UniProtKB/Swiss-Prot annotation:
Pfam families: SPOUT_MTase. The gene is rlmH. This is Ribosomal RNA large subunit methyltransferase H. Keywords: Cytoplasm, Methyltransferase, rRNA processing, S-adenosyl-L-methionine, Transferase. PANTHER family: METHYLTRANSFERASE (PTHR33603), RIBOSOMAL RNA LARGE SUBUNIT METHYLTRANSFERASE H (PTHR33603:SF1). Its EC number is 2.1.1.177.
């Protein structure tokens, strides 16, 4: 199984890079994990609605190029479905049973995701109503993916 994490913007903070790197190492026992960082568009301070739509559209084009035709896509969006870690684990396990070999997670830029990406997604997922920095969300999501595999294995990691 392959797990891809497509992110808009570059990860800058060293502590986040270190945390993600640790979970990438741990995940290598279960899957091929790949994090793809895409260039984000600069948003002007007083951007209009049209400016924001154009920015999201440009980012969506970059994202779309990295999604495989047969990928099971989970896009992170505030309006997405929320569920506990156990259900998330079942979801990941179930994707392979449905014949998918790649799960692709998408974290958008500071403006969120364009509707074209949300429509392409097989599922929209939310970690709640809190707003988290997109770079921190990468670490949280990577840990949850690892936790999902550990739950499937019956590991005491998840208590």
């Amino acid at each position: 199984m392959k797990v891809k994490l497509i992110c808009v913007g570059k990860l800058k903070e060293r502590y986040l890079k270190d945390g993600i790197s640790e979970y990438q190492k741990r995940l290598s026992r279960f899957c091929q994990f790949e994090m793809i960082e895409l260039t984000d568009e600069r948003t002007p301070d007083k951007a209009s609605f049209a400016d924001n739509q154009l920015i999201m559209s440009k980012e969506a084009q970059r994202i779309h190029k990295k999604i495989g035709e047969r990928d099971f896509v989970i896009a992170l969006a505030i309006e997405g479905k929320q569920f506990p870690s156990e259900t998330f684990s079942e979801l990941i396990s179930g994707v392979t049973v449905k014949g998918y070999s790649t799960i692709t997670f998408i974290i958008g830029g500071s403006l969120g995701l364009d509707s074209i990406i949300k429509k392409r997604a097989n599922m929209l997922m939310s970690f709640g109503l809190l707003t988290l920095p997109h770079q921190l969300m990468r670490l949280v999501l990577t840990e949850q993916i690892y936790r999902a595999f550990m739950i499937t294995q019956g590991s005491p990691y998840h208590k």
